[in-house]
Amino acid sequence: MLIDSASMYFRAFYGVPDSVTAPNGMPVNAVRGFTDMIATLITRYRPDRFVACLDNDWRPAFRVELLPSYKAHRVLRATPQGQPDVEEIPDLLTPQVPVLLAVLKAAGLASLGVDGFEADDVIATLAARADAAGDQVDVVSGDRDLIGVVTDRVRLLYTGRGIAKLEELTPDAVQAKYGIPCQYYPDFAVLRGDPSDGLPGVPGIGEKTASIAVSKFGPIEDILALAQTGDPAMSPTIRTKVLAAADYLAVAPAVVRGRTDLTVADLDDSLPRSDADPEMLDALGREFGLASSIERLRTAIASIA
């Protein structure tokens, strides 16, 4: 199981009231919600391996260089070149992130981030490796761009309606919902646009036309090539719109697609048989008022051991 950590702790932060606090008054709603989500996922899906994937860089320079609008609306403060920009995050969430990562570590659950890359890239790399090895993989995220990693062995558990109502996206489910092969979802998103990521899309091409174009012609590179050669299979209307957006289409696929070629450190991602640091886990429970959530996590892990 590969989880998109930021996607989940943002959902936890907004889903659990900030009246949930530690004894010292610090809000711990995101920590509690995140921990409870993981316990629920482990209990329901019973993974034998688990990695919490991290955004070491939420807006990587290589993507911004290709498409400056990428996530630009979420920048709180630009930083010197070579350092990640500061993301606009709720003030009450920021101090909770180290706590939830400490809970993972003390429980013995693996986490992984790669400098210069997003969690999506870590997930895409680990999912591709596991798929090639013949392993079944569940990816947990509220980011639909990760539909692009779905295969016969890799399933996306989409959290858009919450953990209690996960949407299980397989190749057949993606085809039924969007009318496209799952590997072409990033191309579909490039054409349609995605304001949440700063993708403008191609003017005049909406979801229906994007679905038709991708299902008929394949990835963006093929669509652009057909438009440039004047292939009669493509309607003049679509050709005109594609050619008008040629500069955008030449770079956007590399922005949206998750990287599958990251160099990642070896890690023990097996579900732990016992707490890695039981004293620390107990201390976190006392300090932050998380004893009940930590006990649920322990119970979930023990049920698999």
Language-model-detected regions and their locations in the chain:
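Non-catalytic nucleic-acid-binding/docking modules located in mid-to-C-terminal regions
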Residues: 46-51, 109, 151-153, 166-305
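Noncatalytic, basic helical substrate-engagement surface that gates or grips nucleic-acid strands
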Residues: 1-140, 144, 148-164, 170, ...
